[in-house]
Amino acid sequence: MFRLRVVLAAAALHGLVGCVTDPTLGVVDWKHGARRGNVVSTYTADLPVTQLPKCLADLPRDQYTTNRYVKVRYRNVRLTRSAVAQVPPTLDIKDGDVIELWPADCEAGSIARITRVLSVKGQ
């Protein structure tokens, strides 16, 4: 009887673990520097240069207005960091989406890369 209870408890626990596992874990290329990030906001084309981060303010204005840029938050060890990334024209990215990010230092003038959408907000 005791053994049956242990087996049933283990089966229930195993079933619950599947409910809380994030499906995007394990699909990011961590080994080569990619991170799992959340899109926080989109930089609009009409935003004044004084309100842009350094890497976007340094771009020629026509390059800034013809491309889409987003602010992304990602975790690096225990710290939450922010990055500015250009949205590839082939991807439809919205605020709240989870993406694969290749971080870069915006203060040094570098813009991060987004390679794919891992999950869409609301799904």
Give, region by region, the residue ranges found by the protein language model.
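Bacterial N-terminal signal peptides that target proteins for export
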Residues: M1-L8
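C-terminal motif of bacterial Sec signal peptides marking the signal peptidase cleavage site
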Residues: G15-G18
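Bacterial lipoprotein signal-peptidase II cleavage site
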Residues: V20-V27
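Short coil-to-beta-strand transition motifs
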Residues: V27-S41
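Intrinsically disordered, glycine/charged-rich N-terminal periplasmic/extracytoplasmic linker segments
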Residues: S41, C55-Q123
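Short, conserved beta-turn/loop elements at beta-strand boundaries and strand-helix junctions
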Residues: T42-V49
